[in-house]
Amino acid sequence: MKVSVYVTLKNGVLDPQGKAIHHALEGLGFRGVNDVRVGKLIELDVDEAVAQAEIEEMCRKLLANMVIENFRIERQGQTTGHPAGQPA
């Protein structure tokens, strides 16, 4: 089963890479972009038996830095997000 994990910086955490992209877009003449935040996409291919809780644990222990990042998990058509990377 394919699982996508989206990792993004928490609100309030400075995003220098996003700021650099925003500045570059303006320099290239693109207008109307108010902000840019950069994150990462991690794709996993897991057995169907792998529980949601186990994937969340992978995120908390390795895939996301829980101090500064949030994560959101999508399993083939399902989306489960935890804004602070915490169980709902």
Where are these regions (language model features)?
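Long, contiguous binding/interaction regions
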Residues: 2-41, 47, 54-88
